[in-house]
């Protein structure tokens, strides 16, 4: 590398410089924005947040670094508040401009240090120093001890001049405030003491007769005045002021005659001067010094009492002497020193004045460089205004400190007791610093004394609650306002969200001075009573000790008696000391209260609201915007907007409006290296819908237009404020406040800058936020969940909500640990043996491989990118489809395949399946159907053509609202489709076995399409080739239908009677992508767009892949879909000609009153409210229908009676009786005997109908209608019978499972195939398959197109009628007829297999043949979180597989065992109710009644905690479809995993028991 390359500004050089610099342990460098890493790392491996569209900085030319520089040990250590400890330098590296920009974090730095550092940074910028040299230069600068000496703090050795200035300022202030008070106090005390002494002289005139006594009296008088002098010293009044007020030569002579007293006076003066020089924060005096001094004073006092004759005068003088001596020693250091916070504020004010010129000079220099002279003046004025505002605020806070708190900090025990009893704030929290202020109060950073936790505490002064008769209404309003504020505070305290500043608690306190004022009014009676009680208690204890001592020790020595007397004297002296100290505290409070009251109003009636909040140590969004960093990082802006929207959506869901959304109220906090935005400062919050709010409240430039106009508003006002914030985040920092005001004011008028309009994505989002009309603004939820910008996170949000709602679930803990625990992938070199695959011959064997997963993901991603570049929109299509569009309910049959049947032998791996299936043809109308738990007919998604057709049909109006001719849309999706897999047997079967198998196949069919055309077996073989022909739009529809039906019959016969075929247990899963083009009939772009090369030209899909997934754990997973079907509504509608809307409600009323339908009159009463014609006849029919009962174990007989009832009823309706061409002959065929010994020979019987129709016979309309209605009801009855037989066959044996699934062939779209086969050499495999499918959409417009057709002619005529009457429909079929729908399915699994073929590095030693790639496991069709699983098998716990894996029962904790079919609905009802309580269950139907306690052991590995069995109380276990279910006529037996069991008769008690457990 050349020298130029080493100094060039590139990512590699910057990383090398970072590595070299961080070797120094005092330099830490963090990469904040990953643009630097993107320069040296592959783009695919980046873990950054990706958005749908990249911004203009998508090349990541900008990188942000944070450089943390520390001071070396031993340097710049002055142990002072303003000590410089470290510096945070923000470095912005622009690789495109080839420059570095430096800024410094000033929040933790003194102003003097900040200005000096800015000068150094300006020097670096001017000299254009490189990155490494710049950081080293700054590091050496901060370690220069002389350079960073701050002139703002005091040093004992230096800066004497500044020290004297501050001391003079403080002394003058004290003299001014206390001079007048001291004069008044001095005169008052002097007069009192002189009067007392004169009164004593009047009583004792003998003292004037004796000169010595007179001198003694003068000494007492002088002693009193010396006490007065000391008292004034305690008041911080200088001695000269005292002597000017106390006139008389007596005091001068006193100090001249008595040298000791004069020395004492000098010592007091010197002590006061020294006290002013020392630190006034030192407020602690040793308790031992207090006690020693008080003892000495007591000794002097006792001697003085013994020597003098007049006890009264002596006590009075001694008392004053004692008081002033004790008070002087106790409070010499701190009684009248300035409070610590007051001292800091005064020092801060003085320092601001001293360095004001220095700061202005720096601002002027910076202003000249950036904005010129005009901008410099504006910034100068702004700084001065902010500075004055800050000073004013600190003075106000200092003035509002309660007197009780000030005295308590100085050591006043009475004030401490008042705070302890009445103030939670001052009792539980330390004040650290002020964080900010506002119109409602200020915020203080506090720390809990007990738990040492830091909080932010907002203090709001409430309105004065004092009653005033003249302003009665005003104070009532203030009271209401206070209650309103309290309600809002409590409401806000309930909010808890990741993106909202947490509000922990709120409470109201009286001003603590209010309680001090009450004590003053009561003259401290409570305190005095407390002192008196303590004195009495001590005396009582002393007397008890003396009495007990006399009883026990009658012969006590004199020395012991003396010791007892000494103890009693000590107790007495302690009482005296305590009482005197309390009196001094009281005098102190009285004096300061008078001083406090004269200077300002104490406002003792004020109340304060305290709101305890989460402390966010980071910055606000306002600071991030002003520094100019955030506007360059578009991805960060979108991420922050998303988080803010989440917070706003949450508070709106809680029916709360913020009303003050602005950047300064949004806090940025870094937690675990993740930037989180939190909404705070809910000062203007109110409930949504509150009409008693001030519309104009808020911050200018951020309030909505409706607020400015004084109109009613709702939560959409917060959305407008967010729009202004969003605009500021993208806008560069404003140079002046005037520019900011003009730009933001234009937003209210709908005027936006041109650069914002240029970006369509940003402008559309901003327009949705700043719409002038509130109704046109989007709500927070829609912006977050329905906006294109955030829709890619829907799945993540659903998963997060699921995990968040079920935090205590064991599976959720497993998911979290799996996702976030560190683990290593171990590559195993084991070779799979060929015999290991024998058990899984019907399933693909996959192995785990991390590299393969990555490459498959890359393949899928590249195909998706190709589709996105073509403008396709991603749409989710359902797995389960509605069969009302596709199924033919008549073309159903049931068949059972028993291969290798031998009644005397039981062999493993035998296949015994029962299918409820449709004809195995290629007609799109004859697909497999299933019944869900609600009785709806459904099918699995067998192709994306059908799922997209259903989606388009249901939602076409939203895409083509105005029936436009230029309709053109492109969609794509990916997922799995399912079809039945037919496997060909390789072994020949004996003829007898074949015949037996054919005889056991039972078909229930109503289709006899006997059209014969020139078709043969070759038709089936050549079907794919015919399907891949060119577009054949003009083909004759009748011929197509004829060919389809003919081929269907041949295929049915071939497959159902060919022993070489059998069905696989599970449907085949195919992972696919689907690309769809929807265009109008006049638009010709569809054919051009749907081209293979245009789709795959940009996708390099042939990538090396050598292994596939492992899904062995899902082997033999069971799914059972079951339902009960009610015929009553259909019979009322089809047989009795009752309208649809009436038949539905009437059927409900009849079922509710089924037990009361005993006579015709009651039925007539039910029919009267529906106004039905022929009410008498209909009542007779309904009554006869309800007379048909279902007896025990005779469900088939009951269904036969229903058959006869419908047949007779429809025959009677027919006005013209013709000779029936259709003969229906019921034949009872015994059900096939199964291999299990548990099967009863009296099993259910299936009714077989052979229906033959003559196609050439012409029937009249009314007879044809009756036949169609009859066939429809018959088909539903067949379904009910087959479901009943399916559940009650009693053929549940080993290795047998019952699944309802579908049959699907690849070549159903045979008319217009556009996509062909991707060929390599001679191997042809369908990878992409497509065609037109708008005909399917048209067919959906008429649900009865293929329903109930009696013959081929009916089908043909029906098709013609549909095509002829399309233009007459009034529904969305008008839109459907104007579109063309093209689509292509891409088989991802086959693409993977092609890649495997082309890859020579196959890691597994198994020959892989793509043609044998048949079936996959039923792995991706799983029930949703709001649906339970049902199974039907005798062995729920399967035998362990080769890898010792068991079935995975997901999150199921409860298994419900059912033995009778009649209790299956009860089990379903129980599971549904448990699911509403977030308790999932697995329902199992089995006749194998084994000991439960033995079974429960098998469930321990599956984490199933409860095993519930449901048994009937009575012996009648018949299934009566019309009889209401009695949920309490069963016994619920529950066993836990510890083999503890109990029984419940009531379902509610059982559910409560389980809820308590979970």
From Swiss-Prot:
Enzyme class: transferase
Induction data: Down-regulated at the ring stage by melatonin.
GO biological process: negative regulation of translation; post-transcriptional regulation of gene expression; protein phosphorylation; response to starvation
Catalytic reaction(s) noted: L-seryl-[protein] + ATP = O-phospho-L-seryl-[protein] + ADP + H(+); L-threonyl-[protein] + ATP = O-phospho-L-threonyl-[protein] + ADP + H(+)
Ribosomal protein listed as a keyword: no
Enzyme Commission number(s): 2.7.11.1
Consequence of gene loss (knockout): No defect in erythrocyte asexual growth and gametocytogenesis. No defect in the production of sporozoites in the mosquito vector. In blood stage parasites, phosphorylation of eIF2alpha in response to amino-acid starvation is impaired. During the asexual blood stage, increased in parasitemia induced by host melatonin is impaired.
Keyword Ribosomal protein: no
Any matching Pfam family: Pkinase
Protein residues bound to ATP: 435-443, 458
Family: Belongs to the protein kinase superfamily. Ser/Thr protein kinase family. GCN2 subfamily.
Biological function: In blood stage parasites, phosphorylates translation factor eIF2alpha in response to amino acid starvation. During the asexual blood stage, involved in the response to the host hormone melatonin which is used by the parasite to modulate its cell cycle.
UniProt protein name: Eukaryotic translation initiation factor 2-alpha kinase 1
Source species: Plasmodium falciparum (isolate 3D7)
